[in-house]
Amino acid sequence: MATERQYSPLDRLLLQADSAMRTLLPSSAHSQRPSPAVVQPEHKMSEADTRHVAGLMRINHTGEVCAQALYQGQALTAKLPKVRKAMERAAEEEIDHLVWCEQRIHQLGSHTSVLNPLFYSLSFGMGAVAGVISDRVSLGFVAATEDQVCKHLAEHLEQLPTEDGKSRAILQQMLSDEEHHAESALEAGGFRFPAPVKFGMSVLAKVMTKSTYRI
């Protein structure tokens, strides 16, 4: 029976550095699943609608950058191996979303946010701190974060132009995946954060969405 490889602290730091580079460097990550947008036709939109959709997708891309950093930070400090594995697996699944959003942004003739390195660093730090406190808090933080992401996705789906089936297909699949991640974190023993904490997280999320819509 094969034994699981044991990584040293240096190994884990190098793996985190590799993950950060794949997350932040353009076109360096690769999805496991094809984008839901590939089966949708491209319909012409007005210039204003195209700019607006690009801004929404840029927000969602940065949200996935934050998710990657959050999971990687938690995986670095998680106490139980099964929790660490769960965080690493969730990060891998989020890569699909990251790639899909980046592809759509480029199709719309726009760019990803220049603020991504800043938000990656902040999210990684918060994830690592949550992991140090306890695995229950770490899992609860995942659930609360995914709840915020789901709210943004639902709002963005309402704002999309009717003719933009490509972006809609991507966001619908992302919403389904994120709801599953939130449920899984709670089922694994995650702590349900109280309303004041969730409110504070929503304020931070608004800072991210307002700043990355254009830059």
Curated annotation (Swiss-Prot):
Q: How does it sit in the membrane?
A: Peripheral membrane protein
Listed A to Z, the keywords are:
Cell membrane, Iron, Membrane, Metal-binding, Monooxygenase, Oxidoreductase, Ubiquinone biosynthesis
User: What does the record note about the cofactor?
Assistant: Binds 2 iron ions per subunit.
Give the pathway.
Cofactor biosynthesis; ubiquinone biosynthesis
Q: Which cofactor does it need?
A: Fe cation
Query: Which reaction is catalysed here?
Result: a 5-methoxy-2-methyl-3-(all-trans-polyprenyl)benzene-1,4-diol + AH2 + O2 = a 3-demethylubiquinol + A + H2O
Q: Which GO terms describe its biological process?
A: ubiquinone biosynthetic process
Instruction: Kindly report the protein's main subcellular placement as a broad class.
Output: membrane
Database matches in SUPFAM superfamilies = Ferritin-like (SSF47240)
Any one GO MF annotation of this record? metal ion binding
Q: Name the segments for region: Disordered.
A: 26-47
Q: One matching Pfam family, short form?
A: COQ7
- The EC number on file is 1.14.99.60
State where Fe cation 2 binds. 94, 146, 178, 181
Q: Please, which domain of life does this record's source organism belong to?
A: Bacteria
> Which cell locations does it reside in?
Cell membrane
Family stated for the protein in its record: Belongs to the COQ7 family.
* NCBIfam families (UniProt xref): DMQ_monoox_COQ7 (NF033656)
Could you tell me what this protein does?
A: Catalyzes the hydroxylation of 2-nonaprenyl-3-methyl-6-methoxy-1,4-benzoquinol during ubiquinone biosynthesis.
Indicate what this protein is called per its UniProt record.
3-demethoxyubiquinol 3-hydroxylase
Q: Which organism is it from?
A: Pseudomonas syringae pv. syringae (strain B728a)
Starting at the broadest rank, the lineage of the source organism is: Bacteria, Pseudomonadati, Pseudomonadota, Gammaproteobacteria, Pseudomonadales
Gene name of this polypeptide = coq7
